[in-house]
Amino acid sequence: MRKLFLLLTVILPQPIKQLFYRRVFGWKIGRRVRLGLSYIDAGSVDIGDDTCIGHFNVFRKLAKLEIGPTTYIANFNQFFGSDMRGAASCLVLGTNVRFMSRHFVDVAGRVEIGARSTIGGRDTQIWSHTIRIRQGRQQLEPADVRIGEEVYVGARATLICCDIPAGAMVGAGSVVAKSFPAESSRLLLAGNPAAIMKRYPPADIPPSSTDG
């Protein structure tokens, strides 16, 4: 029944839709938020002021959805939580994030995208689960993905259970399957598997990016 209500809410006029989300589900939705024809199914939701979510996005089986102010999510994106054991299914987008169209995010673990970061182009995939051998058997386990502040991710990149430091750029088509520690310079990560291709001057890197 809950899923049916959420599905029907998608087509409601903007003021009624947001009122329904607040009153019925207790979600926190800021001022001047615009919600397009997108399906949102999450346990708790906190959307900051002036955020815009476009059309035909799907947020499914999320335990927690947190979106900072002035963030923009375009169209046809998929954010899928998981029922696997230990799944956090937590998606956190910082302030002024730009998330363009036709991307896929597996939110089995915790996926964080820092302030002023951009997921550009189309067809990028972000995966937050891995497979391990437990007592001789294969077992899926959730893992985290952390994208720092002011990161740019190019089209058709694949990010798997990794940390991307603040200020980094991920080249189009790259496959990032390991974490890269923060440095005093901006990193260009590219290739399959991704490696550090170039270091740029540290101008404008957020102070937090070099903290332990």
Where are these regions (language model features)?
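Terminal amphipathic alpha-helical/low-complexity segments used for targeting or macromolecular assembly
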Residues: 1-32, 50, 116, 130, ...
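Residue-level detector of alpha-helix boundaries and kinks
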Residues: 5, 17-18, 36, 102, ...
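A sequence-level detector of short, solvent-exposed, charge-rich linear segments
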Residues: 39-40, 86, 187, 208
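Flexible, glycine/small-residue-enriched loop-and-beta-strand segment within the central core
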Residues: 40-47, 52-164, 179-182, 192-193, ...
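C-terminal/domain-terminus segments
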Residues: 169-187
